[in-house]
From Swiss-Prot:
The keyword S-adenosyl-L-methionine applies. It is found in: Cytoplasm. This is tRNA1(Val) (adenine(37)-N6)-methyltransferase. It is an enzyme of class 2 (transferase). HAMAP family: tRNA_methyltr_YfiC. Specifically methylates the adenine in position 37 of tRNA(1)(Val) (anticodon cmo5UAC). Keywords: Cytoplasm, Methyltransferase, S-adenosyl-L-methionine, Transferase, tRNA processing. It catalyses: adenosine(37) in tRNA1(Val) + S-adenosyl-L-methionine = N(6)-methyladenosine(37) in tRNA1(Val) + S-adenosyl-L-homocysteine + H(+). GO terms for biological process: methylation; tRNA processing. Its EC number is 2.1.1.223. The lineage of its organism: Bacteria, Pseudomonadati, Bacteroidota, Bacteroidia, Bacteroidales. PANTHER family: TRNA1(VAL) (ADENINE(37)-N6)-METHYLTRANSFERASE. SUPFAM superfamilies: S-adenosyl-L-methionine-dependent methyltransferases (SSF53335). Belongs to the methyltransferase superfamily. tRNA (adenine-N(6)-)-methyltransferase family.
Amino acid sequence: MSQPFFQFKQFTVWHDKCAMKVGTDGVLLGAWTPVESSARILDIGTGTGLVALMLAQRCSASVIALEIDGTAAQQAAENITRSPWGSRIEVVCQDFRLYSNKNNSLKYDTIVSNPPYFTDSLKCPDSQRNTARHNDNLSYEELLKGVSNLLSPNGTFTVVIPMDASDSFKDIASSQGLYPSRQLLVITKPGAPPKRTLISFTFIKQDCKEEKLLTEVSRHRYSDEYIKLTREFYLKM
């Protein structure tokens, strides 16, 4: 049985009640997202609260951690309460579509999401895990429409998605007036094609700066660039 919690340098994330556990995608999103000058941050689909906690560690912004699943929201709230930043992070248990419609007068400097990514794969009997993994609960179109309503004029939206969804996601984003400014191609082992990508979007059309990140040089041996990006979080970096 896997550990029921993951220990970081400044906080602990319990994930035994959450469908999706602490993983590389969330850590990369929390470490790579630009948060300079952010006063208000929205984390869509916070799960365990990992990304919200990482962003709170990196800046002094107030953070809304939004989660549709009640059990996950409760565990996120517990993780956040135990952290040094409990007073700056609020967990809201609500469907993002409802939240974006009711709160479109609120604007966020930074919005992040590690959205569900399976579109047509077979589902498992666990409804909580299906919600966390399958995007029929929140499509990319619905996600990006809501983001365009809530993002401040000079704000940044950063997302982690499968590499094969990158082009279609950018097309949908552009239909909502959002354009890529930075893109990170994540390579898990030398010589392999990227399977994940992180993209930052703004309302400003510009050249997109593309970067590559190799996470491991061999099994359980992290690359220097991955260590540099995540050393403020992982215990043994």
